[in-house]
A protein has these predicted regions:
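Bacterial N-terminal signal peptides that target proteins for export
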Residues: 16-32
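C-terminal motif of bacterial Sec signal peptides marking the signal peptidase cleavage site
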Residues: 41-42
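Extracellular/oxidizing-compartment recognition motifs
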Residues: 47-129, 133-520, 527-528, 544-549, ...
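Well-ordered alpha-helical segments within folded domains of soluble proteins
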Residues: 526-537, 546-547, 579-591
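Alpha-helix capping and inter-helical loop/turn segments
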Residues: 540-541
Length: 591
């Protein structure tokens, strides 16, 4: 198992990145804005006189960088009466050294006004935070004007530093409940820094001492699992304490173990298997010593209350099976069994250094329409990609079905006709875009962890009469959390609405890769993406998403050069839409 890309992939990645970074060049579409009498605004703070927007690998302050030559980039201010003729980069493991002109690690001086450079100093160490800043000199002044200090933190830079084993449970691909895993350990010394890296075949949610690590959803991003799996590194220093500590992991199927059936045959993927993961905790103590804690068969596992999950359809949850405190110290894990060590499912693990999927907004229903004593339809203010959060108390064993859709029929009931026609269910146990929740009799809360949907309306039906209101169900919008970088407005209300609708549609189709729709397919259609990219990059900093996706192209390309029309894919798409209209994405996206 490799922890770095091979040289061929590195060459492709560097080419792709350079092209994506140069996307700022103006195209003919820019002139169309002028012809329409509109204005395109940049969000750049022109009043700044110091360098700004410092990034490493296209991300501000990333954690988990796994290359020895990270790309550093920044923006320089526009000086009205002077010009920049030299840029200096200073880097150190000690932020206090950067307060002056000292650097205990690396510095570089470049003539001109460059806005990016690749680190070329001495080898970086794994699990180490590096601080850096940018300064510039002008033609008229020798004084250097510095930026604020930024940083990046490395992850695992060598397989020699990886101590975790791949582990799974005793079940096969047909088993439906999602597993819990836990590991209890003792800390007897004071910690300076604790970094936890996890890579999973399937989706994961990570917690430490009962607290969720990070604010990401649907990690790791979708890849061709046989060839590449992404790892995620979290700084968990603040979550640990002296004495007993517990790491908790819940695994979901994602695209790895696709138990739903549709026309693209993801259930027949060559990689398909029961979800598994590998993880390690790197501890640096205040006395200067370090320690690794990795996954192995000593970890314990059992079933979670998630009794079914599909990235494509929905999630089913039995609140009666909840295990309060399962990922916290003091929990009695009697009855749990040991995890099984297993083989690595992939050739390569790469760090997921990109804008993650996050919750970006919440919406209360504009209407909660009661159909009868056991059926309600929620109307939300906009069509979104995401999930719903249910908070309800009802009779123990009552089954709620939350049917998400974009249309209503003439009776005001959710109509799935526009989104479920590629679905090929083998029975009625996995209804499309329909979460199923079995109530515990107490106050229950449910929000899917391993699924997302496209919807504006939700039909909630109950197996027994129940009283619901608009407070019981909230719509949660999520997507790859790419920063907005452009703003557009005009004197035309219609054009302004079109711009807002375009952005909403673009974001609803950005989940670690560009998709065609967040409900019917969730596929990375190459043709759809190259049509949308120019508009997308004018409005959002999505370069890290497209760079990851271009690496997916490298994984999917056949030896004869053929690419599928959906990327990633399991088997479908190599003999359909292979002309320039679709395959040209391999050139248009980097451009």
């Amino acid at each position: 198992m490799k922890y770095q890309q091979n040289s061929k992939r590195e060459e492709k990645s560097k080419f792709i990145t350079n092209q994506l970074t140069n996307m700022a060049h103006i195209s003919i579409r820019s002139y169309l804005y002028l012809l329409l009498g509109t204005t395109l605004f940049s969000c750049a703070p022109q009043e700044l006189k110091t360098p700004f927007e410092l990034k490493c690998e296209n991300i501000p302050v990333p954690v988990g960088v796994d290359t020895q030559t990270p790309r550093l980039s920044w923006k320089l201010p526009l000086l009205e009466e002077d010009s920049i003729n030299r840029v200096e980069i200073w880097l150190s493991t000690d932020s206090t050294q950067l307060s002056g002109r000292q650097s205990g690690y690396w510095n570089k001086s470049i003539i001109g006004a460059p806005i990016r450079v690749s680190y070329d100093g001495q080898p970086l160490d794994s699990y180490t935070t590096y601080y850096w800043k940018i300064g510039y000199q002008t033609s008229s002044k020798q004084k250097t004007t510095f930026s604020p200090i930024s940083s990046f933190t490395t992850g695992c830079l060598s397989s020699d530093n990886w101590k975790g084993k791949w582990i799974t449970d005793k079940h096969d691909i047909t088993y439906r409940p999602a597993p819990y895993y836990r590991k209890s350990f003792q800390l007897d010394k004071t910690i300076e820094q604790a970094l936890l890296t996890i890579a999973s075949a399937g989706l994961h949610e990570l917690s430490v001492n009962g607290q969720r690590a990070g604010n990401h959803f649907l990690d790791p991003m979708y890849t061709h699992f046989n060839k590449r799996i992404l790892s995620v590194t979290h700084d968990v220093t603040s979550l640990l304490s002296m004495g007993e500590n517990v790491i908790g992991v819940q695994l979901g199927n994602g695209w790895y173990n696709h138990q739903s059936t549709a026309v693209w045959f993801f259930d027949k993927a060559s990689w398909r298997n029961r979800p598994k993961f590998t993880a390690q905790l790197h501890l640096r103590y205040t006395d200067g010593t370090t320690e690794y804690l990795g996954t192995d068969s000593a970890w314990q596992t059992t079933d979670s209350p998630v009794i079914f999950n599909s990235i494509y359809t929905a999630e089913h949850y039995d609140a009666q099976k909840e295990l309060a405190g399962w990922d916290s110290p003091g929990f009695n894990a009697t009855g749990w069994y040991h995890a099984q060590e297993t083989e690595s499912p992939t050739e390569t693990i790469k760090s997921q250094v990109m804008h993650p999927i996050r919750e970006t907004a919440r919406y209360t229903a504009t209407q909660c329409k009661k159909i009868n004593d056991s059926c309600y339809v929620y109307h939300f203010p906009k069509n979104i990609a995401g999930v719903t959060e249910l908070k309800v108390k009802g009779k123990k064993g009552t089954k709620l079905r939350l049917k998400h859709g974009e249309l209503l029929d003439k009776n005001g009931i959710v109509n799935m006709a526009n989104i479920d026609y590629h679905y090929r269910p083998t029975d009625d146990s996995d209804p499309f875009q329909t979460d199923i929740v079995i109530l515990s009799g107490k106050q229950d809360r449910f929000m899917p962890k391993f699924n997302y949907k496209g919807f504006q309306f939700v039909e909630v039906s109950s197996s027994a009469p129940i009283q619901l209101s608009d407070e019981n169900l909230i719509a949660v919008e999520m997507h790859s959390d790419v920063p907005a970088i452009g703003y557009w407005s005009s004197s035309s209300d219609l054009l302004n609405k079109i711009w807002k609708a375009t952005n909403s549609s673009y974001l609803a189709n950005l989940f670690g890769y560009p998709t065609d729709c967040p409900q019917r397919e969730k596929n990375g259609w190459t043709g759809d993406a190259h049509i949308a990219i120019e508009t997308g990059l004018y409005n959002f900093d999505g370069i890290s998403i497209y760079e990851k996706w271009m690496n997916d192209f490298c994984d999917e390309q056949k030896d004869n050069g053929i690419l599928p029309c959906i990327i990633p894919t399991s088997v479908w798409g190599y003999d359909w839409a292979n002309g320039v209209d679709w395959t040209s994405a391999v050139a248009i996206i980097p451009w």
